[in-house]
UniProtKB/Swiss-Prot annotation:
Record-linked SUPFAM superfamilies: Bcl-2 inhibitors of programmed cell death
Family recorded in the similarity comment: Belongs to the Bcl-2 family.
Function statement: Prevents premature death of the host cell during virus production, which would otherwise reduce the amount of progeny virus. Acts as a host B-cell leukemia/lymphoma 2 (Bcl-2) homolog, and interacts with pro-apoptotic proteins to prevent mitochondria permeabilization, release of cytochrome c and subsequent apoptosis of the host cell. In addition, plays a role in the inhibiton of host BECN1-mediated starvation-induced autophagy without affecting basal levels of autophagy.
Organism phylogeny: Viruses, Duplodnaviria, Heunggongvirae, Peploviricota, Herviviricetes
Protein name: Apoptosis regulator BHRF1
Transmembrane residue ranges: 166-186
Membrane topology: Single-pass membrane protein
Subcellular location(s) per record: Host membrane; Host mitochondrion
One GO CC annotation: host cell mitochondrion
Residues glycosylated per entry: 22, 118
Note: EA-R is part of the restricted EA-complex.
Quaternary context: Interacts with isoform 1 of host VRK2; this interaction is involved in protecting cells from apoptosis. Interacts with host PRA1; this interaction seems to modulate BHRF1 anti-apoptotic activity. Interacts with host BCL2L11. Interacts with host BAD and BBC3. Interacts with BALF1; BALF1 acting as a negative regulator of the survival function of BHRF1. Interacts with host BECN1.
Broad class of where this protein is predominantly found: host cell
Gene Ontology biological process terms, A to Z: regulation of apoptotic process; symbiont-mediated suppression of host apoptosis; symbiont-mediated suppression of host autophagy
Length: 191
């Protein structure tokens, strides 16, 4: 079955919230799941495999993720639109790659984790951020469909395999693009 990027990312954020949260699902994720009924469970094999892959990307690049997120979240009034702006910067030439897609998904999962696990984050910031990342991510659907879907892309990326290591390497390189885009985005000013 072909899943949308929105469905995959939401299932990943819910899965990640269960793994790293305090045992409860953030109300924003509950609402998003009601608004976009999931055709796959956060416990689905595809979600679990992507979660392992993205966790590895986040772990290997934790300083980059933290620094980029801290710069990004300095102003929150239009954070939903800011996600779209960063997405456009990363994929501006219309030439997505698996590395770019995974770096984007890992960054979004990290952002969701950071927001949902911090009890002092205002509800509206979490809401705007989750909505922004889910909506921006829909821009990957055409390319993902051309590649055979999210399920096909993960089939050969089994932890410990050579392809898994190569995918991690490419995603790590792509993170440099994410950092550059966030710096450009911030230095140009917002809106």
């Amino acid at each position: 079955m072909a899943y949308s990027t929105r469905e995959i990312l939401l299932a990943l954020c819910i899965r990640d919230s269960r793994v790293h949260g305090n045992g409860t699902l953030h109300p924003v994720l509950e609402l998003a799941a009601r608004e976009t009924p999931l055709r796959l469970s956060p416990e689905d094999t595809v979600v679990l495999r992507y979660h392992v892959l993205l966790e590895e990307i986040i772990e290997r690049n934790s300083e980059t993720f933290t620094e980029t997120w801290n710069r990004f979240i300095t102003h929150t009034e239009h954070v939903d639109l800011d996600f779209n702006s960063v997405f456009v910067e990363i994929f501006h030439r219309g030439d997505p790659s698996l590395g770019r897609a995974l770096a984007w998904m890992a960054w979004c999962m990290h952002a969701c984790r950071t927001l949902c696990c911090n009890q002092s984050t205002p509800y509206y910031v979490v809401d705007l951020s989750v909505r922004g990342m889910l909506e921006a991510s829909e821009g990957l659907d055409g390319w993902i469909h051309q590649q055979g879907g999210w399920s096909t892309l993960i089939e050969d990326n089994i932890p410990g395999s050579r392809r898994f290591s190569w995918t991690l390497f490419l995603a790590g390189l792509t993170l440099s693009l994410l950092v550059i885009c966030s710096y450009l985005f911030i230095s140009r000013g917002r809106h």
